[in-house]
Amino acid sequence: MNPSYKGKVRDIYDLGDKLILSSSDRISAFDVVFPQLVPDKGKVLNRISVSWFEFFKDVPNHILETDVKYFPIPFQNHPDLEGRSVLVKKCKRIDYECVVRGYISGSGWKEYKNDGTLAGIKLPSGFKESQKLPEPVFTPAVKNDQGHDENISEKEMENRIGKELFNILKEKSISIFLRASEVVDKAGIILCDTKFEFGILDGQVILIDELLTPDSSRYWSTDTYSVGISPPSLDKQILRNYLETTSWNKMPPAPNLPAELIQELREKYQKIEDLILSCTSQKSK
């Protein structure tokens, strides 16, 4: 069964007014897909995302069904989809990534070091790497399915889509981020940053894509967090770190990865799943 669209790590089946989103075991870094699979990665990401959508069920979203046996024929009980897929409403995608940062890290830290800004917003001097921001900062990006997303300022996004829609996206993104941060904190996890995606269906803004997975978010453990360094992430950062030690030029084809690294990645994904599901199993407030 061939998907209608095959992304770096996700397969999409177009059913007309609905879509099936299937999370594969493929892994990518620097926008390049690697030849090996990480066993069960797709199922882990799917379970995490579904658990968050259920937790935030008060926020309108695109989910229709999470159990393959209730998918339309001929997709019912299909082994390639089992446990890693969701049936969703097709909507008009808003082509922006709504990134929220609670800490100054990654590309945000690089920008601040160079320019004293974060997404074009001037920040006070004296911030250190991985320091918590006084309040979450909204740093949008234009989606680019063929390559790197383009970071833009709040003002530029507002000018492109209008003040009303911009305010809705910003407010929803920061609200979900704050609620999720409070929830995972109870399990000793820090939500450093994440990205949300939204669509429009019947005139309503709804939450789409994946939600608060370790592929769309940066999670840290409170046990290893420290200001002034880049703390170990509970995600595929170990893959990026490994690649930085090689001579690979970050262009296709991707190199083969050591078996022990694949196993370590698998364990990382399973660990963050256990931690997150222990939080999201409680009823959304």
UniProtKB/Swiss-Prot annotation:
This is Phosphoribosylaminoimidazole-succinocarboxamide synthase. PANTHER family: PHOSPHORIBOSYLAMINOIMIDAZOLE-SUCCINOCARBOXAMIDE SYNTHASE. It comes from the Bacteria. CDD domains: SAICAR_synt_Sc. Gene3D superfamilies: ATP-grasp fold, B domain (3.30.470.20), Phosphorylase Kinase, domain 1 (3.30.200.20). InterPro entries: SAICAR_synt/ADE2_N, SAICAR_synth, SAICAR_synthetase_CS. Keywords: ATP-binding, Ligase, Nucleotide-binding, Purine biosynthesis. Disulfide bonds: none annotated.
